């Protein structure tokens, strides 16, 4: 009886996630303030599709050691940020030859269920071979876009696969430099996808497609010679109407791509604007940013830089300005009080944090964001490099690609840092940090140089201190 009892207890622990060898729980978070405003984070860039959130009652400051670590989860290969909604956290990575979706409790990290499928892919440049696109959630259906261009719909309460589309087989998608990268976008009952298909004899293929969210049935397609980029499509209001913006352009000879403006319901093309570096080894990756009622900022880092576009009453595009020295690699810049802030540049040595005026694109300041850090008795000069920006409660937070996290005070005159900590020292920390219900989620994508930490997802207590 004793043996059976022990086995019974063991099974209970496994079911409840207490025997998860990859999960390490450090502490409990503070209670969430009753006055706190919280928001779901159902997709890449959040509810507002621009890297901003209305979360309030957040931690006012923190020391060099960083906010309190609540839990950490060892992960496989991935560049995907977590998705949080419906009281669940969804993590997407590659482990043991399988792309793996995990549903976990956001506060404890405990596993609720997982879903796996086999993939064969190896990044040709030696980067991570895991998924690039974050899961996208709408109601009770979650959409996955894997690194091999496999599109799947998963029911979040049962982990049941509802439908699956192989974009390579169905539309002739050819995996680009870094595999498939753009996250889908769910608009009403449609899943909008930057397909990047290739037609017969290299003719125009299905560039963008819409699928029924519940069945996966094709609803409409838009054909174009521009291939899939690493920029995720978004739907935003322009001149009072919802418009689908797709910044297309991946691996192709000759290099081509640019912004497509489409009706999300029908796929009708309003206009297209060519914006792509001439170099073969270039891609478009930064998500378009809508500014005001009728303007959109697009950028790339391989030579063209950034451009501000304006839509007229017929949704035709004209150029307001171009600035070759203001181009983001993949990060989404923030627009604050008629100024654009972002990490501009292609590679680590040439990246600078810059501020440009919306009105004319003039660059007001640039900062290399260098700082000193002691590692194993050695003084190192590090930077935020190709960092990410997150705006909450009118506060701006930045994650550097080597693991530094800080709060920025941004003005047209410059940048000041109010709190900063080196959470870890590891390269390729490119996923956008997420704040949900006062908890901060940060991804480490490569093995750390300090304490040999493995790739992991970390949850920090970012709730404000109690006033009692």
Please report, for each region that a protein language model flagged, where it lies by residue.
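Sec-dependent signal peptide recognition
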Residues: 2-10
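Hydrophobic h-region of N-terminal signal peptides that target proteins for export
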Residues: 10-19
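Noncatalytic, solvent-exposed loop/strand surfaces
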Residues: 19-468
């Amino acid at each position: 009886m004793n043996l059976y009892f022990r086995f019974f207890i063991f099974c209970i622990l496994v079911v409840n996630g207490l025997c998860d060898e990859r999960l390490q729980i450090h502490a409990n978070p503070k209670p969430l303030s009753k006055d706190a405003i919280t928001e779901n984070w159902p997709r890449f860039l959040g509810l507002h599709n621009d890297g901003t959130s209305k979360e309030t009652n957040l931690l006012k400051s923190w020391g060099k050691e960083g906010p309190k670590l609540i839990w950490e989860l060892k992960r496989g290969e991935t560049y995907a940020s977590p998705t949080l909604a419906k009281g669940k956290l969804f993590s997407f990575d590659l482990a043991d030859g399988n792309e793996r979706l995990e549903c976990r409790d956001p506060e404890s990290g405990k596993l609720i269920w997982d879903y796996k499928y086999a993939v064969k892919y190896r990044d040709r440049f030696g980067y991570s071979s895991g998924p690039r696109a974050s899961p996208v959630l709408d109601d009770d259906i979650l959409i996955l876009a894997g690194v091999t261009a496999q599109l799947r719909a998963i029911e979040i309460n049962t982990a049941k696969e509802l439908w699956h589309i192989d974009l390579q087989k169905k539309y002739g998608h050819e995996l680009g430099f870094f595999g498939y990268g753009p996250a889908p976008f769910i608009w009403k009952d449609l899943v909008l996808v930057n397909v990047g298909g290739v037609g017969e004899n290299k003719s125009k293929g299905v560039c963008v497609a819409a699928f029924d969210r519940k069945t996966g049935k094709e609803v409409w397609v838009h054909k174009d010679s521009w291939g899939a980029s690493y920029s995720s499509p978004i739907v935003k209001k322009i001149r009072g109407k919802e418009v689908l913006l797709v910044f297309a352009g991946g691996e192709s000879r000759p290099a081509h791509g640019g912004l497509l403006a489409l009706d999300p319901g029908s796929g009708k093309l309003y206009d297209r604007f060519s914006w792509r570096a001439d170099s073969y080894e270039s891609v478009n990756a930064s998500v378009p940013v809508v500014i005001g009622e009728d303007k959109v900022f697009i950028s790339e880092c391989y030579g063209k830089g950034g451009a501000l576009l304006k839509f007229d009453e017929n949704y035709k595009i004209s150029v307001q300005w171009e600035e070759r020295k203001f181009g983001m690699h993949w990060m989404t810049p923030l627009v604050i009080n008629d100024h654009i802030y972002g990490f501009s540049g292609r590679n680590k040595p040439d990246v600078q944090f810059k501020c440009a005026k919306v009105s004319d694109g003039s660059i007001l300041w640039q900062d290399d964001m260098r700082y000193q850090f002691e590692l194993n008795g050695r003084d190192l000069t590090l930077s935020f490099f190709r960092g990410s920006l997150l705006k909450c409660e009118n506060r701006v937070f930045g994650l550097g690609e080597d693991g530094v996290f800080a709060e920025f005070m941004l003005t047209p005159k410059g940048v000041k840092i109010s709190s900063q900590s080196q959470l870890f020292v590891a390269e390729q920390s490119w996923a956008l940090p997420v704040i949900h219900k006062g908890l901060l989620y940060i991804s480490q994508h490569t093995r750390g140089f300090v304490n040999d930490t493995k790739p992991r997802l970390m949850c920090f207590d970012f709730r404000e201190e109690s006033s009692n």
